[in-house]
């Protein structure tokens, strides 16, 4: 049985990931190795291993950073306590926090200053959630599901607002927001939807892909939130959906009896991994590869001034 590979568009790296990787590479170029990075700069094993080979040292605790070293915050952002600790240690710091995550941080501080309690829609333990909730000392509560909304306790229902993790499922978040508004009619919304453009575009693209395919393969690492959401979105469309870190994890039996194979990638997965997956699937009697139409992304985020090229 001949097969066709269909590629989602857009897929792979977003502007925030491009910027975060460039910050690490540029810091190594200017300051020399080692450059310390708090947490994986983006959630992709291939990217992290590549940067480690160039001289990046990934740590979770600042106690592991020698005094006077250069430190980079990951794209997911950090709590205010980490910034204070880095300053106390006299570290040279570059911030690779995605600007769209920083926007949520600013929103949280604004809401807190206005005297509002804040509900954070997100996944417990994710570094973006920890960073966002760590922008204020108190008065912020985590909600992960619609069921959580029913048991939520707040001090003042009339002084309540919400923000979201930027990499969530658009549809799932919509349901949670609807539940919040039903229980707390006076809840304040953020000025703009917190789900980032790249998350939205990739989820829209995988829905289109799943509608035309018998199976969808998402390229992404297990700890990548947006990659996991892509697999879930595809599965909800009723097709077999798998997520793989690399081509070696593909199982031939997945493709038995499948004629149209969809491939996409999370925002932290490089195109080189996608091409390797395509090459591997081609061995399963694939006759053609086609790319679906999609949204063209032109967003570019600038590097910190000290890391920008002079010319």
Swiss-Prot record:
Isopentenyl diphosphate binds at residues 43, 76, 126, 224-226, 268. Binds 1 [4Fe-4S] cluster per subunit. The keyword Metal-binding applies. [4Fe-4S] cluster binds at residues 14, 98, 196. Its EC number is 1.17.7.4. GO terms for molecular function: 4 iron, 4 sulfur cluster binding; 4-hydroxy-3-methylbut-2-enyl diphosphate reductase activity; metal ion binding. The keyword Transcription regulation does not apply. (2E)-4-hydroxy-3-methylbut-2-enyl diphosphate binds at residues 43, 76, 126, 166, 224-226, 268. The active site is at 128 (proton donor). GO terms for biological process: dimethylallyl diphosphate biosynthetic process; isopentenyl diphosphate biosynthetic process, methylerythritol 4-phosphate pathway; terpenoid biosynthetic process. Belongs to the IspH family. Catalyzes the conversion of 1-hydroxy-2-methyl-2-(E)-butenyl 4-diphosphate (HMBPP) into a mixture of isopentenyl diphosphate (IPP) and dimethylallyl diphosphate (DMAPP). Acts in the terminal step of the DOXP/MEP pathway for isoprenoid precursor biosynthesis. This is 4-hydroxy-3-methylbut-2-enyl diphosphate reductase. The lineage of its organism: Bacteria, Pseudomonadati, Pseudomonadota, Betaproteobacteria, Neisseriales.
